[in-house]
């Protein structure tokens, strides 16, 4: 996979079937749930350097997720997407609910439970293959 990013915030970043959006755009809809990724983002077996202040989502969920005011369980994604469970979409996050690798938006009614705190990212397929349906806390 490859990516094309500007320095600092992304204007747009594509890799594989995923889109990466800048936090400035994200904050227009979700100012209280901004998601940040570290300078090195692990996606599958590849490392992407220089990734900052972004969140990622599968392109297949782009319309339903980005236009919604909040992330609801009605935002469905393909079952075979590495960042999606059969019911909800997961997003990369680093700082929030402690130092966590992969987490999800909407902690509470729509969020998955955050993974154990730590500095390293979890492999996406490992995360999505497990059943995280408790709320964040």
Curated annotation (Swiss-Prot):
GO terms for cellular component: cytosol; intermediate filament. InterPro entries: KRTAP_PMG (IPR007951). The keyword Chloroplast does not apply. It comes from the Eukaryota. Belongs to the PMG family. In the hair cortex, hair keratin intermediate filaments are embedded in an interfilamentous matrix, consisting of hair keratin-associated proteins (KRTAP), which are essential for the formation of a rigid and resistant hair shaft through their extensive disulfide bond cross-linking with abundant cysteine residues of hair keratins. The matrix proteins include the high-sulfur and high-glycine-tyrosine keratins. Interacts with hair keratins. This is Keratin-associated protein 15-1. The lineage of its organism: Eukaryota, Metazoa, Chordata, Craniata, Vertebrata. The gene is KRTAP15-1.
């Amino acid at each position: 996979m490859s990516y094309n990013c500007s320095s600092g915030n992304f204007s747009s970043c594509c890799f594989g079937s995923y889109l990466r959006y800048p936090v400035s755009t994200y904050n227009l809809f979700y100012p209280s749930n901004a998601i940040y990724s570290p300078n090195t983002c692990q996606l599958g077996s590849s490392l992407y350097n220089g990734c900052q202040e972004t969140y990622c989502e599968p392109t297949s969920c782009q319309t339903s997720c980005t236009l919604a005011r909040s992330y609801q369980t009605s935002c469905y994604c393909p079952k075979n997407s590495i960042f999606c469970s059969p019911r909800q979409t997961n997003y990369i996050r680093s700082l929030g609910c402690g130092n966590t690798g992969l987490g999800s938006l909407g902690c509470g009614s729509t969020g998955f439970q955050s993974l154990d705190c730590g500095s390293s990212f979890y492999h996406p397929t490992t995360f999505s293959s497990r059943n995280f349906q408790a709320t964040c806390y």
